[in-house]
Amino acid sequence: MNISYNWLKEYVNFDLTPDEVAAALTSIGLETGGVEEVQTIKGGLEGLVIGEVLTCVEHPNSDHLHITTVNLGNGEPTQIVCGAPNVAAGQKVVVATLGTKLYDGDECFTIKKSKIRGVESIGMICAEDEIGIGTSHDGIIVLPEDAVPGTLAKDYYNVKSDYVLEVDITPNRADACSHYGVARDLYAYLVQNGKQAALTRPSVDAFAVENHDLDIKVTVENSEACPRYAGVTVKGVTVKESPEWLQNKLRIIGLRPINNVVDITNYIVHAFGQPLHCFDANKIKGGEVIVKTMPEGTTFVTLDGVERKLNERDLMICNKEDAMCIAGVFGGLDSGSTEATTDVFLESAYFHPTWVRKTARRHGLNTDASFRFERGIDPNITIYCLKLAAMMVKELAGGTISSEIKDVCAAPAQDFIVELTYEKVHSLIGKVIPVETIKSIVTSLEMKIMDETAEGLTLAVPPYRVDVQRDCDVIEDILRIYGYNNVEIPSTLKSSLTTKGDCDKSNKLQNLVAEQLVGCGFNEILNNSLTRAAYYDGLESYPSKNLVMLLNPLSADLNCMRQTLLFGGLESIAHNANRKNADLKFFEFGNCYHFDAEKKNPEKVLAPYSEDYHLGLWVTGKMVSNSWAHADENTSVYELKAYVENIFKRLGLDLHSLVVGNLSDDIYSTALTVNTKGGKRLATFGVVTKKMLKAFDVDNEVYYADLNWKELMKAIRSVKVSYKEISKFPAVKRDLALLLDKKVQFAEIEKIAYETEKKLLKEVSLFDVYEGKNLEAGKKSYAVSFLLQDESQTLNDKMIDKIMSKLVKNLEDKLGAKLR
């Protein structure tokens, strides 16, 4: 927000430089990003002087150019070639001399000596738009005859200089969205730093109703959305250009003057943070303003000429027949003041922040008014600002105040009562601040001390401080005015945090696994926990009924919390694939959120909600790219399986103690589940369905693994990693070719083998699968290798044969396996 240095001084007296003001505001929480010297006219008209055209003749080589000589007050006529149709001898004009910078928006160009059609030109005679004092380009500026050649243009036009402070207002500081609001905080800073200061604002004691010739009734039908609405009429106004002082104020902060009536409303909102609206009183049909909602789907044309369909919860300002304005957001096309307006109705209201915010979001509108209303303005300043605006309209546009102020207020805004203890102040700030200093700070921030004891204060916080409703909020205010830099950093820190425990172990293991995956060529991704509810439509794996929905989403693309990491990863894959990067390996750690309506409990609001920490892996594209050593090789689900198994091994899990099952659902076309013997799901991995990939415009196969990190951490609690020396005795390998039913999986063979020989069997591996000729229908052949080793002796043939015979028998009994 742009704050004028000179405007600020109208409300609080100080002797600080602009840079010192910026530093002071930053130190008390109103971060000021920069200070810029500005003029009421961009560039300050530097280098421009008043000149008199002495001679004007036609250019010999042009049918529209003129050669002039101009007296610039320095004794020597200056030759300038001019193309304006209205240039003539004897005129007083504005001349840009050599080196002058003229601005066109954000760009500028420098006046240089030049030759135009063979004739030397030393300067430029200017039009309004070329020097920033108007928009006309029909011809050069012709000044009154009393203008004196040689006078600097900045003096002739009374250009004022000022400094603009770029103050970054955080969303909670609605009270600081104005010059007066910033002045309040600066006043508190000055008082705390021992400087004499006073906070003032213009008096409205002179406000008086002169007649009742234009009485307009006000009715509020929805007091929830509009707790306060006030209005007054001014009759017989003349809409015209604003006086120079008002135009300059607005230009300094980056606003374009419109006319006196509109400029007054803009002045008020930037001075005191109260948005106003000015209606043409003669367009208020039926002589009544009604604040209400309209039926769903009602059409309304706003000031920008756009026809909008209203929601049933869009609050509208209406007359007896039509809607005139979207309350607190945007005016209507046909109800505002124009140059033909003679009577006005001024509106000053307090609209509920939630109503304004939702309406503004629905219609994609962001105005100065909605910016302030949706954060919460001061409900008690509405009448003051209305009186001030009416007095200014009377002064600058003429007319008479022709009605009483109609103030419809559901209930007066009450102060927030806060109990503050000195002990908590000292505890949260980390320093003992003198009681008198605390009292001085809170009173300088316009908080009233209602009661005082040895232990603390009872404070009444004004309603405009919507961010201060608890004792910790008051303490934050005390700290920022006292000064963050005045709180010494202690030599020791008292902390309840511990460097030990499950949380720390989980973080270490997460980093361990992340490094392992990075070493395997994975890239970590971080996706938003907010996602699109439409992704879950029709899914049985992740039903829509289990979504944690947002009450006030920013958009339909971010309207719920994710149930799975999958969709964020598919978005990342699609994004990369669209940029010709299709060979991808991603991993992500993140929370997934669930809602279970059956767990609703009035006494435990959060009971239906849960979150689990997960690890997601995505593999797609080529595993090996074409080279002199290898041909292209696409990745597969077996590669993903290896990554999952390696993670389990790295965490110390015994793979043989896990239960593997098959899965096929609306996420996976084929997949495996990995559970503990107690039935807890540790992981699911497999091939993502074509339908799911199509929804994300992904062409390649995608293999996805979902690991429940929370359950993994529970599963490894009892795992103890022990070290032992490498066996001195050789290992022995035996191979079996087994004929089995097609439905038998290798995991079943592996499980039976380890159950058969728990001590000497070290490894079971599959090195060949055959299906086809010379095999019975419904059969397949597995070539399986078994690695045996004894830690204490060398195995002999008798021992090996005994083990292998037992293995063959168990495989035959349990799986129907036959040796080939």
Curated annotation (Swiss-Prot):
Residue ranges of every copy of the tRNA-binding domain listed in the record: 42-154
Segments forming domain B5: 413-489
Cofactor note: Binds 2 magnesium ions per tetramer.
SMART domains: B3_4 (SM00873), B5 (SM00874), FDX-ACB (SM00896)
UniProt GO MF annotations: ATP binding; magnesium ion binding; phenylalanine-tRNA ligase activity; tRNA binding
A GO BP entry: phenylalanyl-tRNA aminoacylation
All residue ranges annotated as the FDX-ACB domain in the record: 727-820
Enzyme type, top EC level: ligase
UniProt entry tagged with the keyword Cytoplasm: yes
Catalysed reactions, as listed in the record: tRNA(Phe) + L-phenylalanine + ATP = L-phenylalanyl-tRNA(Phe) + AMP + diphosphate + H(+)
Positions bound to Mg(2+): 467, 473, 476-477
Cofactor(s) recorded in Swiss-Prot or TrEMBL: Mg(2+)
Matches recorded under SUPFAM superfamilies: Anticodon-binding domain of PheRS (SSF54991), Class II aaRS and biotin synthetases (SSF55681), Nucleic acid-binding proteins (SSF50249), PheT/TilS domain (SSF56037), Putative DNA-binding domain (SSF46955)
EC id: 6.1.1.20
Listed GO CC annotations: phenylalanine-tRNA ligase complex
Keywords, ordered alphabetically: Aminoacyl-tRNA synthetase, ATP-binding, Cytoplasm, Ligase, Magnesium, Metal-binding, Nucleotide-binding, Protein biosynthesis, RNA-binding, tRNA-binding
Gene3D superfamilies per the UniProt record, alphabetical: 3.30.56.10, Bira Bifunctional Protein, Domain 2, Ferrodoxin-fold anticodon-binding domain, Nucleic acid-binding proteins, Phenylalanyl-trna Synthetase, Chain B, domain 3
Location in the cell: Cytoplasm
UniProt cross-references to NCBIfam families, sorted A to Z: pheT_bact, YtpR
HAMAP family named in the record: Phe_tRNA_synth_beta1
Subunit structure: Tetramer of two alpha and two beta subunits.
Family from the record: Belongs to the phenylalanyl-tRNA synthetase beta subunit family. Type 1 subfamily.
Name the UniProt record assigns to this protein: Phenylalanine--tRNA ligase beta subunit
Organism this protein belongs to: Bacteroides fragilis (strain ATCC 25285 / DSM 2151 / CCUG 4856 / JCM 11019 / LMG 10263 / NCTC 9343 / Onslow / VPI 2553 / EN-2)
